[in-house]
């Protein structure tokens, strides 16, 4: 495992909820995410396992042939406390003239409407349909639903308008950005004891699965993954038919990764 204790750090350029630093490594810029203490008192874990969720989640997306940010795990020793931490190192894909267009910010582009867009499927579609720049709208919708299917597999409850988007290159060409921000996947707040309990109790596991929901709403109701996957909209159905066979094919590799 790479040791970043004496790495070449740059002034931080990244925001968001977790603590981050900017790293120059092998001639490339990386965002380094650090583990944080949980914000909720309802968990017994001392640190959120979001760095492992980020790395494994992105690796699973890549194994399913969906572009995602390149990541690796590394160790870092705090110079003041001497405490060693495991961090996730995420390659910045906004290099060589590329620029990330967060989906929420694209919604602000629509000055012809006074509407405030929220995390509903209807609003996602409305934003896409109102694009007035050159982009493949079908490809954006397909990317959204492909990402949705894999987020369901990962149990990600926190894919919203701020953590996915489009990538614009130096020539102005626009396409879906690589998937990033998978830190809420794979139950990062669950303790090892809780996970072992779920593995041993089939009924408890089913309850856990049935309570998994997306942050999105559809037709006025919060989306529970198990419900919408049973009766999917047409575009989601197409993504299910495309992604599920990939999941089955990649299952041994995913198991080995986890």
Write out the residue ranges for each language-model feature.
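A structural signal for well-ordered alpha-helical scaffolds and beta->alpha junctions
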Residues: 16, 54, 121, 233-237
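A diffuse structural propensity rather than consistent per-protein peaks
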Residues: 102, 117-123, 250-257
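Active-site-proximal helix-loop-helix substrate-binding element of RNase H-like nuclease domains
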Residues: 107-129
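Conserved kinase catalytic-core segment
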Residues: 122-191
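C-terminal catalytic region of ATP-dependent kinase domains
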Residues: 169-258
């Amino acid at each position: 495992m790479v040791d970043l204790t004496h790495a070449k750090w740059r002034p931080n350029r990244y925001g968001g909820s977790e603590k981050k630093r900017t790293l120059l490594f092998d001639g490339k810029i990386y965002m380094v995410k650090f583990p944080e203490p949980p914000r909720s008192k309802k968990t017994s874990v001392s640190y959120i396992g979001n760095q492992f969720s980020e790395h494994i989640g992105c690796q699973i997306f890549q194994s399913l042939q969906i572009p995602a940010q390149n990541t690796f795990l590394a160790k870092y020793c705090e110079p003041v406390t001497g405490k060693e931490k495991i961090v996730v190192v995420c390659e910045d894909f906004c290099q060589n003239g590329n620029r990330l267009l967060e989906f929420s910010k694209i919604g602000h582009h629509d000055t012809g409407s006074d509407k405030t867009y929220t995390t509903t499927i209807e609003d996602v579609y409305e934003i896409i349909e109102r694009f007035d720049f050159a982009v493949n709208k079908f490809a954006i919708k397909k990317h959204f639903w492909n990402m949705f299917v894999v987020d369901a597999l990962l149990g990600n409850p926190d894919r919203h308008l701020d953590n996915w988007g489009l990538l614009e290159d130096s020539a102005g060409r626009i396409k879906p950005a690589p998937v990033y921000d998978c830190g809420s996947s794979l139950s990062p707040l669950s303790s090892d004891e809780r996970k072992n309990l779920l593995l041993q109790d089939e009924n408890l596991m089913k309850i856990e699965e049935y309570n998994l929901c997306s942050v999105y709403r559809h037709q006025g109701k919060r989306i529970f993954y198990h419900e919408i996957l049973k009766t999917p909209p047409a575009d989601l159905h197409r993504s299910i038919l495309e992604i599920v066979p990939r999941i089955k094919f990649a299952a041994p590799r995913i198991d080995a990764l986890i």
